């Protein structure tokens, strides 16, 4: 099992912190365990409340069912069903920018 460094950033929320996240744990769950409050609703990859945008690195979000191909290509990620697959940087609180 690999453990990756996931940097979570959101200027509007004053958030810029790096967490450690195993490659078999969702980013949202790891953030919560480390005391970081991120938005979420369904926790199943079926809505957009937890949306973020990967600006560096890669994630595996094969469990998601909400984002379309264009949103995926643009780097959007649902943190509730995303595993890190490298060290990465994720802009959080991106639900509004999806639309």
Swiss-Prot record:
Q: Which molecular-function annotations from GO does this UniProt entry contain?
A: 2 iron, 2 sulfur cluster binding; electron transfer activity; metal ion binding
Q: Which CDD domains match?
A: fer2 (cd00207)
Where is this chain primarily localised? plastid
For the 2Fe-2S ferredoxin-type domain, which residue ranges apply?
4-96
Q: Where in the cell is it found?
A: Plastid, Cyanelle
Could you tell me the Gene Ontology terms of the biological process aspect for this record?
electron transport chain
> How does this polypeptide assemble, per the annotation?
Forms a complex with heterodimeric ferredoxin-thioredoxin reductase (FTR) and thioredoxin.
Q: To which protein family does this belong?
A: Belongs to the 2Fe2S plant-type ferredoxin family.
Name by which UniProt lists this protein: Ferredoxin-1
Please name the gene that encodes this protein: petF
